[in-house]
């Protein structure tokens, strides 16, 4: 479909605030637009509740589906491994939230991908977050060196944006490795927040296979790793 407008912030309810454009021009399948924000279809605001029999409200891009089914059929992060040993848990508080693709300064990783600022993402070293990450201002972000400058994203898989360490449904949170991690210095992913696979009823369920690999010679070359 068409590209989404820039995502400027993520609120505590998990919606994406956008600037410019119209809902008709920027909606992609599976997303809905309301009050200047984009939501997965089936996620409705307090101001726009679902009324009467199940169906598509006037502002929806399609029929309602569960958030779990939406994210399991539209994976945000590629699954590189089915082994839970490749998922590193961390007790660190700061986090980078992996969000659906937007065009707000996020570029594909690789040669020539430079210019944008954000959580540092260096070639071969994964993602390094900073305690000064801000979700609303670029002044706290620092650019990366070498080939890729963050935030960056493999084409079609998503984008990185600074946010809080909220574990609400649909978000994949990469945390810096800490004392509890088995691979200090590499991106970590909280197993409890790996909710990409829909359960029998479509509700999000932990999916250890949607984890991050340690960076190095065995890495697939994609970020996150």
From Swiss-Prot:
One of its GO terms (cellular component) is extracellular region. Its main location: secreted. InterPro entries: Corneodesmosin. One of its GO terms (biological process) is cell-cell adhesion. One of its GO terms (molecular function) is protein homodimerization activity. Disulfide bonds: none annotated. Residues 155-170, 202-211 have a biased composition (Low complexity). Keywords: Secreted. It is found in: Secreted. It comes from the Eukaryota. Residues 140-225 are annotated as: Disordered. Residues 178-196 have a biased composition (Polar residues). Important for the epidermal barrier integrity. This is Corneodesmosin. It comes from Sus scrofa. The gene is CDSN.
């Amino acid at each position: 479909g068409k590209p989404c407008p820039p995502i400027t912030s993520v609120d505590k309810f998990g919606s994406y605030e956008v600037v410019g454009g119209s809902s008709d021009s920027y909606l992609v399948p599976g997303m809905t637009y309301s009050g200047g924000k984009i939501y997965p279809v089936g996620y409705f605001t307090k101001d726009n509740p679902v009324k009467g029999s199940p169906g598509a409200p006037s502002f929806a891009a399609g029929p309602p589906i569960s958030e779990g089914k939406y994210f399991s059929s539209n994976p945000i992060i590629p699954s590189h491994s089915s082994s839970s040993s490749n998922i590193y848990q961390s007790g660190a508080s700061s986090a980078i939230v992996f969000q659906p693709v937007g065009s707000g300064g996020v570029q594909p990783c690789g040669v020539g991908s430079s210019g944008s600022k954000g959580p540092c993402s260096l070639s071969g070293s994964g993602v390094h977050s900073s305690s000064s990450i801000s979700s609303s201002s670029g002044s706290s972000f620092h650019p990366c060196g070498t080939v890729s400058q963050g935030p960056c994203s493999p084409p079609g898989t998503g984008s990185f944006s600074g946010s809080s360490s909220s574990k609400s449904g649909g978000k994949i949170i990469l945390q810096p490795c800490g004392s509890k991690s088995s691979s200090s210095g590499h991106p970590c992913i909280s197993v409890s927040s790996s909710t990409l696979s829909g359960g029998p009823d479509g509700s999000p369920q932990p999916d250890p296979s949607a984890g991050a690999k340690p960076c190095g010679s065995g890495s697939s070359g994609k970020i996150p790793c």
